[in-house]
């Protein structure tokens, strides 16, 4: 079975991002495939490479990145949601004349 999963929750403001991550891990552990992950609304905050959680908390964005890379999953970040929340790639940094970018690659 193939799954597409939408992630709407920020990494630490609610349990939804971690729940979605654990669901995705279970899907893969059960022998199923993930067609695409779509980070939307506050879920785009999981794509920032600048998040630094307290030492006693899990690094949820890093776990998403590891899952995506180790399983070669197509991961899409909603551009409008990302821009609204200050998540930019290099092209958007240049386009909007900002001083940096923070989208995980």
Predicted regions span which residues?
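Short, glycine-rich nucleotide/cofactor-binding loops
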Residues: 4-18, 47-52
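Histidine-anchored nucleotide/phosphate-binding helix
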Residues: 17-30, 37
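Short, active-site-adjacent cap segments at secondary-structure transitions
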Residues: 44-47, 83-85
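Helix C-cap/helix->beta junction micro-motif
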Residues: 30-33, 71
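N-terminal glycine-rich phosphate/adenylate-binding segment common to multiple enzyme folds
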Residues: 79-105
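A glycine-rich helix N-cap at a beta->alpha junction
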Residues: 53-84
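Glycine-rich loop at the start of a catalytic domain that most often binds anionic cofactors/ligands
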Residues: 47-55, 89-92
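Short internal beta-strands
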Residues: 35-41, 74-79
């Amino acid at each position: 079975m193939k799954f597409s999963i939408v992630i709407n929750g920020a990494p630490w403001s609610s349990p939804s991002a971690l729940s979605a991550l654990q669901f995705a891990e279970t899907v893969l552990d059960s022998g199923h495939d993930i067609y695409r992950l779509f980070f939307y609304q506050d879920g785009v905050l999981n794509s920032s490479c600048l998040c630094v959680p307290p030492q006693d908390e899990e690094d949820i964005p890093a776990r998403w990145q590891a899952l995506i890379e180790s399983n070669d999953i197509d991961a899409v970040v909603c551009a409008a949601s990302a821009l609204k929340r200050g998540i930019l790639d290099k092209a958007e940094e240049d386009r909007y004349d900002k001083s940096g970018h923070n989208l995980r690659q």
